[in-house]
Amino acid sequence: MNTIKDLRTAAGMTQKAFSEYFGIPKRTIENWEGGQRECPTYLFELMKYKLEKEGLI
């Protein structure tokens, strides 16, 4: 998994559910997935870690 969209779809979440789960505005998720902005690497790794620990991916 190399992108936010990969993480989100692996967890079976919509953009809305993913944004609510992490407390990140939905528009930010849309911008990351659409390529308008880049998710910071440290944040991507933290989100991946949390999803793995929660057993969602």
List each model region and its residues.
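Secretory-pathway ectodomains
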Residues: 3-4, 21-25, 48-52
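A short, Lys/Arg-rich alpha-helix, primarily the initiator
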Residues: 1-9, 45
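Residues within alpha-helical segments
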Residues: 9-12, 40
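Short alpha-helical DNA-recognition segment
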Residues: 12-30
